[in-house]
Each structure stands twice: as structure tokens, then as C-alpha cells.
């Protein structure tokens, strides 16, 4: 307990949560989990923890358990209360602050679990330490049940934290499997030998995954590059040098592939430094200097070859992980490392080790330099093509594409650019738009897949050149986000397979070539309606099949009596729940049948694998609450009940399904999809660069086999699959 230092109170956390966890949306909600897991990882870094369990509980709470030493439970020397209470209720109270417990540690500026406690509706903590099991409970940062001993644990040690985020603070109200999965996998790669077991007991499909990697960063690079063709083996080196506050350790794994993009992932004390920092600048400097020196010394690079650092990083996947005793982070949410001495230390380690690798592997060095020279030549060829896309000045309308129908407003913060599929929809959008703030750019045919094209070929493509010119930020070396002519760039395509393909091609372009537009939140997806529903003189527009089903069930249950299996009449809420469940069973059974399986056989097969089988079993398990089982469904009585309710709901309705944007007239398109007062739009965000990179490589890259495998594994998760 004497190692726990108290620096300040935590009253401010609930008043200004964004200052401590970044935001109160999805990112901040999941950040709570990272804070608790970081404590367990700190125990692993210190050599005391080998197993971490993360569980999303059925009630929406989350548990993190480890087999570390357990949070201290003895009395704090100055606070005169148990140390665990201090750690969990006082901001900046933790063993990491006096340097004797942990050599290095992560956690958000040390606010850690106390911050999570303050922002949780409730938190329960169980500690195994000193042969006893200790239990304490909190609500919104205050103790509700004091520390008590609830059992014996022998020689076992560890901490188990369960918390439920305060929904009055957060706009996000559920943990997402994918988001947590990516971060936990990342932590297992960064801390080789640690086992992280992740389970979701809340969702329909009970996901479960175990992450354990003895290969560490090398396996991380292999994982990131699994959908790319390698041009070099994985190059790994590590070293340590004294810094201002102790020993700085650096570890680097890198590999070149045939990709035209670069993926750089940097970490300090396991914290993902999204904006890079001194460790990244040190690596880049060393890479550039080493390639230049080796190339010149071995006559592979001539004096006339004007190579840039960007040329040398084309196709590179690299992970730089440093351990720094007292890290300085720029920004409250740790996105950029600021310790000046780390640049020189990383640069020195990389220069020495990379030069040695090149000298011992001349064939690999030659391959890397040849790729660099190709990238430089493509960049030079692109320079000429780029001239045609260069802006003559922000918002002056000079040299804009002929088919762009621009708006009159000159303030980019107020303007929107709609990228519309096809000329017919472009015509409707052009006629119906608000000419003051909305610009229309019709796109003819498919946009080039930039995942498979070098920059010179990309800039030779007319649609891409038009896009670059219209957006106004320039490209490559001339890129300047401040010159964006619109702060909303809206992709508006049909709700069919072709529309989805065009949308994906455009997202690939923005993610690979203009990622800052996504980072700034400038890229959106329009959500045009799928159906027009008319009743008497009233017209409504419906976005999705699910929304239409819900509407029909609501209307159908009006004056319609639904009984349970025992003959009891269900109240309105229970009837709606039952009908919604039956509609879900119908949709899942239909998808299973479309994939060539018999749902009646699958649901009774204990060994049946796959998402379809598990979804059906979960749905039928829910159905048992009403007294029915799978046999009642497959006998036909329940599908008939569902059809009867829907038919009742359809009485007096006219339902029209739009096949494309071009089927709407100008006023209709504006009212449903473009009118700021009524429209639905999705903002495109990327919270995990590695996951996004992997997905774009998988879906849009050259390797066919991984894509086929992905489609086979995920076919059941989509309604509209085009073979």
C-alpha cells in the first residue's frame, strides 16, 4: 500500500468525461475496457500475469479477470483506508506513479480504473491475495459495499473487475465484439506469451476467442500481411539504450509486400500511438538513411535517382514498439509520443541492425531497393498527371470538372458534395438539390480499384482525376486538407450489389489516398429509402427490410389477438416481441436454405457448426419462453401466424420497392435522401487502422483465395450476396 501515491481527486471526471477518455461515444465507451485491461497487461509486463479473461456479460456489463498479484488490500499509510479503495476512487492513484512497482506501464495518464469507476453505474471488484478472496462494490466512484473477505483462495492470486458503464453519460450503450477483439488481439501480439481469452455472452451468437502468440510482433506482421504477397522475409530487430529516465527498449518487425500502400503501427508501453511520434520519426529517418547508404555503397542507387522516404516505404508493413519508463504523450488520449530522446535511440538501433541485415541478405536488400526505384519512377510519372488536378485556388471554380454541378456557397463548412452513381440519378439529384450548399458529381461506370493500381496509373484514370479536382485538396506531395472545397463528401449509390461495389471502390480510394478526409469526418454514406409505403393519402419512406417488417408487424397487431401455446392472450408488448422473433427465425431459416442447408436438420444437430446453426439455436431457445419449440415452427403453424399478422398489416397499404436512385423524381430524392432536416446519413470512421488495412487488402487486393474464404465464412451474415 505504501507504493500507492495520491496525486489529486477525481470529481472532474463525471463533469468532463471527454477530457479523460477522449469522448462519450463508442470510442470512449470501449476505452473503459482498455483501461482495466491495461492494468492486467502492466502485471504481465512486470512478469506477474500470464492469463487475462475478458467477458461481455448477458446484462451488458463487462468483466476483466487476471492471475496477477491482485490489487493491494492492506491499509494505505496516509489515506487510512484500504489501498484498493484508494486505487479505485482517487484519480492518479496507482503503483505505476512511483516507479518501483512497474518499470513501464500503459493506462491513460494513470487515471486508469478510478476513471472507469467514476463513469460506471456500478463496479464490483474481487481480489485474490494473501490466501483470501476480498470483495468491494462501488457506484459512480463511491463505495457502496466496503471491502470484505468472502472466501479462501489458497495460493491463487488475481483481480476480477466487473463494471456497467453509466448510460446517462455515454451515447453508446453496448460493447462491440469486433472493436474489442481487434484491441485484445493487438495486446496479445505485443506481449508474447500472454494468453487473452475473450467471450461474448450477450450477443445472439456466443463468440469466443483465445489470443496467444509466442511469435509476438513477427506474428503480428504476418497477420497484417496475410492478404498480401510478401517481397521480403519478416525482418525483426530489437535493442535497448539508456534514456533520460531509464532504459528505453525498442522492438521492430517489418516486411515489404507487393502492395502500393504503407502500414505503420506504433506503440509505446502497449498504447497504440495512432499519430506516431518520436519512435516513428526515428524509424523513418533510419530506414531512409540506411537504404540510401546501402544503395549508394553497392551501386544500386545512382546520383540521378531522387528518392524520398515515401518511395522507400511503399509496400512496407512495420510495427515499432517501444518501452519508455516515463512516456510523454501529446494530447490527453495518448495518440502521439513526445519523448525527444526516443527518436535518436530508435534511429540508432534500426540503423545498426538494418544495415547488418542488408549486408547479410544482399538479395533481399536489392529487391527492396528495386521496389523503391519503381515507386520513385511512378511518382515522377504521376507528377505530370497531377498537374491537371492541381487547384488554382480554393473555391474559385477554375478548372473544375465539366460535369460537376457546383454550389454557390463559398464556406466549405457549409457545403456538401454528392458523388452520385449514374447520370439519371445525377440528373434527379441536380434538379432536386439545394443549389446554395449542395454540389453534384455524377460518376459514370466503375471507379478504378486503387488497391491494385500504382499512383501513375491511378492519375491517368478520368474518374479519379475528376474526383481529386472536385474535392480540391490536391494529391500526394501537394495534399492540403485545408483546401477541401466541401466538408461533407456524400457517397450516394443504389441499394443493390452494383451500388455496394461502387461504394466500396470509393471508400478504398478515400482510405488509401485521402485518409485525412475520413479522419476529419468529412466522408458520409447516404441512406436512400428502399421502400415507399402509401396508406390512404399518407406516404412514408422505409430505409430497410427490417424497418418494413417492424412497421407491418406493428400495423398487423392492431386489433389482432395473438395467443401463446397455452392459449393465453399475449399483451401488445409480448405479441410484438414474439412476432419480431418469428420474423428473425424466418429470415435466418431462409438464409440457411439459400446456402443449401435444411434448417430443420441443422437445429437438431448438436455438432452443426457455423453462424447459421448457432443463430437458429439461439432464436429457438428464445422461442421456448412462449412455450413453443423448433417443431412448432417447421410444422407450419408459426409461419402461418406471422403471415396472417403481416397480411393484416398490409391491408390498405401500397408498398413500392425502389430499384435505384433514378426511379425517384427530383423532389422525392431530395426529401428522402438529401434534405438535412429529414435524411439519414452514416459518417465513415476508422477506429483501427490495422483492421481497416486488412479488410481493404482482403476485399480489394490481388489475392483471390483469402477473399473466397472470407465470403464462404461470412455468407450467412449478408442478405444480398452476388456470386
Predicted regions and their residues:
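Conserved phosphate-chemistry cores used by DNA topoisomerases
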Residues: 1-723
Amino acid at each position: 500500500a505504501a507504493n500507492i501515491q495520491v496525486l489529486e481527486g477525481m470529481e472532474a471526471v463525471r463533469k468532463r468525461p471527454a477530457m479523460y477518455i477522449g469522448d462519450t461515444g463508442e470510442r470512449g465507451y470501449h476505452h473503459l475496457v482498455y483501461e482495466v485491461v491495461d492494468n492486467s497487461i502492466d502485471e504481465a509486463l512486470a512478469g506477474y500475469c500470464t492469463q487475462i479473461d475478458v467477458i461481455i456479460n448477458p446484462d451488458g456489463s463487462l468483466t476483466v479477470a487476471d492471475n496477477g498479484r491482485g490489487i493491494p488490500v492492506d491499509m494505505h499509510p496516509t489515506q487510512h483506508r484500504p489501498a484498493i479503495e484508494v486505487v479505485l476512487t482517487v484519480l492518479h492513484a496507482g503503483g505505476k506513479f512511483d516507479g518501483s512497482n512497474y518499470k513501464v506501464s500503459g493506462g491513460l495518464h494513470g487515471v486508469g480504473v478510478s476513471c472507469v469507476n467514476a463513469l460506471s453505474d456500478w463496479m464490483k471488484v474481487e481480489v485474490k491475495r494473501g490466501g483470501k478472496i476480498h470483495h468491494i462494490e462501488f457506484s459512480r466512484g463511491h463505495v457502496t459495499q466496503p471491502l470484505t473477505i468472502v472466501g479462501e483462495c489458497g495460493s491463487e492470486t488475481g483481480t476480477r473487475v466487473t463494471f456497467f458503464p453509466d448510460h446517462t453519460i455515454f451515447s453508446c450503450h453496448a460493447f462491440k465484439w469486433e472493436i474489442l477483439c481487434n484491441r485484445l488481439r493487438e495486446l496479445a501480439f505485443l506481449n508474447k506469451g500472454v494468453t487473452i481469452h475473450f467471450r461474448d455472452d450477450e450477443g445472439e451468437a456466443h463468440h469466443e476467442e483465445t489470443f496467444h502468440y509466442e511469435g509476438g510482433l513477427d506474428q503480428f506482421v504476418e497477420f497484417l500481411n496475410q492478404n498480401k504477397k510478401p517481397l521480403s522475409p519478416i525482418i525483426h530487430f530489437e535493442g535497448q539504450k539508456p534514456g533520460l529516465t531509464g532504459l528505453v527498449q525498442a522492438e521492430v518487425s517489418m516486411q515489404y509486400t507487393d502492395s502500393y500502400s504503407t502500414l505503420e503501427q506504433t506503440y509505446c508501453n502497449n498504447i497504440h500511438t495512432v499519430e506516431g511520434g518520436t519512435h516513428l520519426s526515428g524509424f523513418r529517418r533510419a530506414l531512409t538513411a540506411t537504404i540510401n547508404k546501402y544503395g549508394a555503397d553497392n551501386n544500386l542507387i545512382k546520383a540521378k535517382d531522387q528518392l524520398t522516404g515515401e518511395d522507400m516505404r511503399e509496400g512496407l508493413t512495420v510495427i515499432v514498439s517501444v518501452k519508455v519508463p516515463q512516456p510523454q504523450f501529446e494530447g490527453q488520449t495518448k495518440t502521439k509520443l513526445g519523448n525527444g530522446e526516443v527518436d535518436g535511440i530508435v534511429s540508432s538501433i534500426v540503423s545498426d541492425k538494418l544495415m547488418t541485415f542488408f549486408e547479410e541478405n544482399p538479395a533481399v536488400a536489392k529487391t527492396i531497393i528495386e521496389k523503391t526505384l519503381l515507386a520513385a519512377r511512378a511518382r515522377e510519372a504521376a507528377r505530370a498527371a497531377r498537374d491537371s488536378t492541381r487547384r488554382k485556388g480554393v473555391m474559385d471554380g477554375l478548372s473544375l470538372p465539366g460535369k460537376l454541378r457546383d454550389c454557390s456557397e463559398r464556406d466549405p463548412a457549409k457545403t456538401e458534395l454528392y458523388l452520385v452513381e449514374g447520370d439519371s440519378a445525377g440528373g434527379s439529384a441536380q434538379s432536386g438539390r439545394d443549389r446554395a450548399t449542395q454540389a453534384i458529381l455524377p460518376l459514370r461506370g466503375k471507379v478504378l480499384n486503387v488497391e491494385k493500381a500504382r499512383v501513375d496509373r491511378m492519375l491517368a484514370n478520368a474518374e479519379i482525376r475528376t474526383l481529386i479536382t472536385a474535392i480540391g485538396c490536391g494529391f500526394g506531395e501537394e495534399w492540403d486538407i485545408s483546401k477541401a472545397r466541401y466538408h461533407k463528401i456524400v457517397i450516394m449509390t443504389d441499394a443493390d450489389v452494383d451500388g455496394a461495389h461502387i461504394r466500396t471502390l470509393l471508400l478504398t480510394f478515400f482510405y488509401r489516398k485521402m485518409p485525412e478526409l475520413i479522419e476529419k469526418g468529412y466522408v458520409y454514406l447516404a441512406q436512400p429509402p428502399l421502400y415507399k409505403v402509401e396508406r390512404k393519402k399518407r406516404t412514408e419512406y422505409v430505409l430497410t427490410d427490417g424497418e418494413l417488417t417492424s412497421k407491418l408487424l406493428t400495423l398487423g397487431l392492431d386489433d389482432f389477438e395473438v395467443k401463446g401455446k397455452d392459449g393465453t392472450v399475449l399483451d401488445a408488448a409480448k405479441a410484438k416481441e414474439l412476432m419480431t422473433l418469428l420474423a428473425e427465425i424466418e429470415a435466418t431459416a431462409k438464409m440457411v436454405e439459400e446456402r443449401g442447408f435444411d434448417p430443420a436438420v441443422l437445429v437438431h444437430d448438436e455438432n452443426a457448426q457455423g453462424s447459421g446453426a448457432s443463430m437458429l439455436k439461439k432464436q429457438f431457445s428464445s422461442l421456448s419462453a412462449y412455450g413453443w419449440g423448433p417443431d412448432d415452427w417447421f410444422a407450419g403453424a408459426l409461419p402461418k401466424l406471422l403471415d396472417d399478422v403481416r397480411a393484416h398489416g398490409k391491408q390498405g397499404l401500397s408498398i413500392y420497392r425502389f430499384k435505384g436512385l433514378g426511379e425517384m423524381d427530383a423532389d422525392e430524392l431530395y426529401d428522402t435522401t438529401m434534405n438535412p432536416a429529414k435524411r439519414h446519413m452514416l459518417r465513415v470512421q476508422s477506429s483501427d487502422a490495422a483492421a481497416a488495412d486488412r479488410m481493404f487488402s482482403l476485399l480489394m487486393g490481388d489475392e483471390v483465395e483469402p477473399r473466397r474464404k472470407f465470403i464462404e465464412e461470412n455468407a450467412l451474415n449478408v442478405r444480398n450476396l452476388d456470386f
